[in-house]
UniProtKB/Swiss-Prot annotation:
Protein name: Large ribosomal subunit protein bL33
Recorded GO CC terms: cytoplasm; ribonucleoprotein complex; ribosome
Similarity annotation: Belongs to the bacterial ribosomal protein bL33 family.
GO terms of molecular function: structural constituent of ribosome
One GO BP: translation
Keyword Ribonucleoprotein on entry: yes
Keyword vocabulary terms for this entry: Ribonucleoprotein, Ribosomal protein
HAMAP family: Ribosomal_bL33 (MF_00294)
Domain of life from the UniProt record: Bacteria
Pfam families reported in the protein's UniProt record: Ribosomal_L33
Species of the source: Alkaliphilus metalliredigens (strain QYMF)
Length: 49
C-alpha cells in the first residue's frame, strides 16, 4: 500500500517535497539528498508526518 509522505529540510525545517512510498518495502523513515530553495543548496531531507 502506497502512502503519501512529506520531506522536510533538516537545516531550515521547511517542508519542500511531497511524494509516495511503499510501506511494505520501506518501513523506516526516508532520508534523501534534495535541493532546498530556501537554503539554496542540497541538504538532507527527512520524512515527516
Amino acid at each position: 500500500m502506497r502512502v503519501k509522505i512529506t520531506l522536510a529540510c533538516t537545516e531550515c525545517k521547511q517542508r519542500n517535497y511531497n511524494t509516495t512510498k511503499n510501506k511494505k518495502n520501506n518501513p523506516d523513515r526516508m532520508e534523501m539528498q534534495k535541493h532546498c530553495k530556501f537554503c539554496k543548496s542540497h541538504t538532507l531531507h527527512k520524512e515527516t508526518k
